[in-house]
Amino acid sequence: MAELATVARPYAEALYQVARQGDVAVWVEQVSALAQVAENAELRQFAGSPKVSAEQVYDVVAAAAGVSLSTGVQHFLRTVIDNGRLAVLPAIAVQFNALVNAASGVADAAIFSAYPIEPAQLAEVVAALEQRFGRKLSVNVTLEPELIGGIRVVVGDEVLDTSVKARLERMKVALSA
């Protein structure tokens, strides 16, 4: 995984340098769509076939993305395909999004909850978390029933775990000590 990140970094940085000259949000949408397509194992197998030209791979990926690609993103996709880096595209998208978020003062937050969170509750939780972490958060909520109750929040390398499972584990450690 580390080698994917190493290969992806220069692409993501170059992509960000070009994207910030225009509408970054459009670039994020298009690159995310391409990354989703590139995660498909059958597509990567097709792209790796020596019988398939780079132009054919480009046509299939661009069509499968389902969004109209700007000229800059088209050039980026051609470069990635020509360099045989289609499999790295999801990692490039992750690093590109991280650069965009860092520049705008936003951090990605993963919220794991035992139960579905209502939109009003989520808004309250996000407001409290933004105050606690001191920055705007882009939130992704995932259901994780094994937490029993409460939530676990991951922002960068910081973890805030208020789940029942974590409390029970702390009690177990305290009682066995």
Swiss-Prot record:
The UniProt record lists the keyword Cytoplasm: no
Topology within the bilayer: Peripheral membrane protein
Family listed: Belongs to the ATPase delta chain family.
Cellular component GO terms, alphabetical: plasma membrane; proton-transporting ATP synthase complex
Subcellular location: Cell inner membrane
Keywords: ATP synthesis, Cell inner membrane, Cell membrane, CF(1), Hydrogen ion transport, Ion transport, Membrane, Transport
Organism the protein comes from: Leptothrix cholodnii (strain ATCC 51168 / LMG 8142 / SP-6) (Leptothrix discophora (strain SP-6))
Quaternary structure, from the entry: F-type ATPases have 2 components, F(1) - the catalytic core - and F(0) - the membrane proton channel. F(1) has five subunits: alpha(3), beta(3), gamma(1), delta(1), epsilon(1). F(0) has three main subunits: a(1), b(2) and c(10-14). The alpha and beta chains form an alternating ring which encloses part of the gamma chain. F(1) is attached to F(0) by a central stalk formed by the gamma and epsilon chains, while a peripheral stalk is formed by the delta and b chains.
Pfam annotation, one family: OSCP
Name by which UniProt lists this protein: ATP synthase subunit delta
Role: F(1)F(0) ATP synthase produces ATP from ADP in the presence of a proton or sodium gradient. F-type ATPases consist of two structural domains, F(1) containing the extramembraneous catalytic core and F(0) containing the membrane proton channel, linked together by a central stalk and a peripheral stalk. During catalysis, ATP synthesis in the catalytic domain of F(1) is coupled via a rotary mechanism of the central stalk subunits to proton translocation. This protein is part of the stalk that links CF(0) to CF(1). It either transmits conformational changes from CF(0) to CF(1) or is implicated in proton conduction.
Entry keyword Transport: yes
InterPro entries: ATP_synth_OSCP/delta_N_sf, ATPase_OSCP/dsu
Alphabetical list of Gene3D superfamilies matching this protein: N-terminal domain of the delta subunit of the F1F0-ATP synthase
One Gene Ontology molecular-function label: proton-transporting ATP synthase activity, rotational mechanism
